[in-house]
C-alpha cells in the first residue's frame, strides 16, 4: 500500500484509540531494517509506523558527510517506493529531536513537506517529534506551539515529549528517578498551550517511569495507570473523554500487563528500538560464530564467499527483526487490524 496520506494517518490513529490497540513504531537505520519492519507488519497483517532518529538519519546520510536531512529524505523516498509492495499501510515519523538539532533536522524536514503540500502533494513524513524534555516546561511548550503551527500547515502531526524518559536515546540522557512521571499540572499546562486538537493534532509522550535501552527487572517502575489519571483530569476539565493520544516510549522489555494497561488508557503508538536492534544483530552473531572459518581467511585458507556475502547473513538479520516486529504487533493488538 502507499505510504499513509494525512487523512489515512488520522484514520489509523482514530482506529487505534477506538479499538484500544497501538501501532508499533519501529526505528530503522538502513534499507534492510526498513524491509524487516515492513515484512514484520505484513506478516502480522498490521499497519505501523516507521521512524528515523537523529542518529539514524545521520547514519543514513553516510559517514562522509553525516547529514541528517539527506539521510532522512533518502530513506523516506525509498520507503515511498518499496512500501507500496507490501499489503499494509505505514506512516513515516522522525523520532526524538532535541532543541540543539531542530535547525538541522525537524525544521528543514517540515519545510520540505510544506513545499510538497503547496504543490498539491502529500508531505514526505506524516509526523515529527519534538523532544523538549531537557528544557523547562515553559520553553518546551513555547517551541511546541511554534512547531505545531508549522506542522499543521504541512499536514503533519507533531509528537511532543513534555517530561523526561529515562536512559539514553541518541545522546539525550535522563536519570532514572521520580522526575520520570508526568503530573496532572504538566498536562494542564500542555492543554492550555497546545489545545486538544483545535490548534492541530498532536501525540503526547507522557512519562510513567519509562526508560530507553536495556535494564534489569526491578530497576524501573512503570506506572501505566498514571495515564488514566491524566486522561480523566483533563477530560473532566474540558468535557472530553480520553483527550490525549499517548505514546509509549522506552517500551522494550515491558510486560504484557503493563502494555495492556497502557493500551486501555489511550496509548496509540509504542516505540521499539532496543529490542529490534538485538533481534536484527543476534542472527548475524550466530552466523559469524558458526561459520568463522568461512567468514575469515584462517590458516592460509581463502574462506567461503557464500558465508561472508552480506546477503547471506543479511537475510537472517531481516528475518530475526521481522519476527520481533510481528511479536510487537501481537502484543499491541494491532495484528490483524490493517486497513483494507
Language-model features: locations:
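N-terminal amphipathic alpha-helix/helix-capping segment at the start of soluble metabolic enzymes
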Residues: 1-24
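Alpha/beta enzyme core
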Residues: 7-15, 31-87, 99-242, 256-261, ...
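Short, conserved beta-strand segments within well-ordered enzyme catalytic domains
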Residues: 25-27, 49-51, 91-93
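Glycine- and other small-residue-rich loops at beta-strand/loop junctions that grip anionic moieties
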Residues: 26-27, 133, 176-179, 216-219, ...
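Glycine-rich beta-to-alpha transition loops that act as phosphate-gripper elements at the mouths
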Residues: 28, 92-98, 244-254
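Catalytic-face loop-and-helix region of soluble metabolic enzyme cores
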Residues: 83-84, 211, 216, 226, ...
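Extended, intrinsically disordered, low-complexity segments
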Residues: 290-340
